[in-house]
Structure formats: C-alpha cells, structure tokens
C-alpha cells in the first residue's frame, strides 16, 4: 500500500498485490525491495515503472539454508551500492547479497539458533551504518548485536 503524505488522504493505493511481504526498503534510486516469506526471496521493483513484475535479486531457489536460499526472509537493508542485507529468520543468520550476485554471504549468525556471540536467534531488524557496521535486533535473545 502507498499513502501520500502530501494530499492528506487516508485511502491507500495498492502497489503490489497477492504477496506475502514482511519487510521492505527503498534505495536512493527509488527501487522498492520486498521480502516474500512464502517464496523465500527478495524482489526489486522500480517505483515509477511496472509494479506487476519484480526482479528476484536474492533467494528464489526454494526454502533452504544454502547461500543462494532463504528460510523465511524478513527485514531488509539496502546500502548505497545497492547491496542487500537480509534477516533470514529460520536459518538464524543475516546475509549480504552484493548487487548482481547470485549467491549471498553469511555475515552474522548461521551457526544454528543460540545465544553465543557467534549465534543469532530469530534475527529481526537490521541496519548498516556508514562505517559498514552491522546492527541486528536479535529477537530470540532479547538483545542488539553489532
């Protein structure tokens, strides 16, 4: 859904329908990124273009734990280079997908769910600052990691 803050309307506009979206982000070039938890993928849409067919830019290879798969991708962060960071809930990891690559890199967690410093449990919100430091809301452990 999209709501314009300029005209004071309380009625939204459907941009993309029939999707199991959990997280979204918009980059500086006005691309919309969404996580589809049922399809286990991240798609990118041009906001000014055809919103019917997004491009799969990460995952989309069924549910799994390989570096080209997700198991319930949720929160997304997109950096200035259009690299995509994804919280992969059921794999208890955060992955980075370099723009244009077919496989991601595990940059946090991925050691099974747990509370050790190298583990995450249900990673949620995430942010990467200008110094490339990753911050993760580790929901299952009630903590913020960096």
Regions found by a protein language model. Give the residues of each.
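Structural signal for beta-propeller blades
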Residues: 1, 40-43, 92-94, 142-144
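Conserved beta-propeller blade signature
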Residues: 31-34, 84-85, 134-135
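Loop/turn-rich, solvent-exposed surfaces of beta-rich toroidal or solenoidal domains
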Residues: 93, 117-146
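Short loop/turn segments immediately following the C-termini of beta-strands
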Residues: 37, 81, 89, 99, ...
């Amino acid at each position: 859904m999209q709501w314009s803050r300029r005209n004071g309307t309380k009625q939204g506009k459907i941009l993309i329908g029939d999707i199991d979206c959990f997280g979204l982000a918009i980059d500086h070039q006005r691309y919309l990124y969404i996580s589809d938890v049922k399809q286990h993928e991240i798609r990118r849409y041009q906001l000014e273009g055809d919103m019917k067919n997004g491009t799969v830019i990460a995952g989309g290879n069924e549910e799994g734990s390989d570096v080209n798969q997700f198991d319930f991708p949720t929160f997304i962060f997109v950096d200035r280079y259009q690299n995509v960071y994804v919280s992969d809930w059921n794999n208890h990891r955060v992955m980075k997908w370099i723009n244009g690559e077919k496989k991601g890199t595990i940059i946090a967690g991925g050691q099974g769910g747990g509370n050790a410093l190298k583990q995450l449990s249900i990673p949620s919100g995430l942010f990467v600052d200008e110094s490339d430091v990753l911050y993760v809301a580790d929901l299952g452990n009630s903590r913020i990691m960096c």
